[in-house]
């Protein structure tokens, strides 16, 4: 009994599910049949069906900018390192105990400033000894000269032999030689005493002290007492591709100093401006580059030895150049081109010859003129002769474009 009772319930459930499925199927079919005639009727009432209906839709939105005429600087760029104009390790030239340091670590010093003192006692004693010996020998020389004068008078009356006269003359000459040696000894002792006062050999900034007061130092110490780096002026050494050498040489022949700018590691902040000093005399065969040195006054201490910077050197300025945003320049099978807008906002493809460019602007040497409007965004939707809707059109007469132009003129571009 229980088995037949369960079977009946299973049959009832299956029948209910089948009924629900049939109802949903019938309802969906009626909806599709009622929608089809309305859609067909709407298509028939439309003035232009199919593709013509699509063409009557909204115009493709694009952004545009106006080509402008301006002076464009040309820069050569490279990576470089700041180096001190001079780097000197200050060492003692005499042996002795370090008595005093007369500088603060990091301060600027001038050539001749006193930096340190070595105990001068032994050098003063040596000087006094040399001076005493000199005085003694000078007295001996004076006495020998007086004797020589008497011998010369006596020789005239044959009271002194010629041999005695010659011997006295030789004694005078010998003593004169001794005097010269004594004078050299005095000068040497004086020099040793002077060297006990250690002075700055060049202008520059002193580093950290390498030895403390009280230590015994030697003239043979390679570490030295302190290192001085000359930072006013300071140099920048950077590299350029060998292909840029001719451009630099030609710019140098113009007779004007070439301006070199130092920018920070991120190339977003200008640190200082200097001038080209020289090119190296050979190309690095491994990298195909040449080293270039520029010099900066660095009075504001914006540059520091061993600092990494981006270098930019102005080599030329292209006057009356036609400039457009780089985003407008496209590349196709026929070469570079831009989409130009006419007065009716219809676009046409113009082949162009680009010149100097960077990430923001590009110089167009042929193909368009100043005042032409070019498409900068929405280019992928364009076809020849299509009419478009210009949205947020950019013009160089706006304050935003003027700011961009000033920034471009300041930074320039690399060819």
Swiss-Prot record:
GO molecular function: efflux transmembrane transporter activity
Taxonomic placement: Bacteria, Pseudomonadati, Pseudomonadota, Gammaproteobacteria, Enterobacterales
Protein keywords: Cell inner membrane, Cell membrane, Membrane, Signal, Transport
PANTHER family per the UniProt record, alphabetical: MULTIDRUG RESISTANCE PROTEIN MDTA
Species of the source: Escherichia coli O139:H28 (strain E24377A / ETEC)
InterPro entries, alphabetized: CusB_D23, Multidrug-R_MdtA, RND_pump_MFP
Family: Belongs to the membrane fusion protein (MFP) (TC 8.A.1) family.
Biological function: The MdtABC tripartite complex confers resistance against novobiocin and deoxycholate.
Gene3D superfamilies xrefs: 2.40.30.170, 2.40.420.20, 2.40.50.100, Helix hairpin bin
Subcellular location: Cell inner membrane
Topology in membrane: Peripheral membrane protein
Subunit structure of this chain's protein: Part of a tripartite efflux system composed of MdtA, MdtB and MdtC.
Biased composition (Polar residues): 31-47
A matching Pfam family: HlyD_D23
Signal peptide as annotated in the record: 1-21
Induction conditions: The mdtABC operon is transcriptionally activated by BaeR.
Protein name: Multidrug resistance protein MdtA
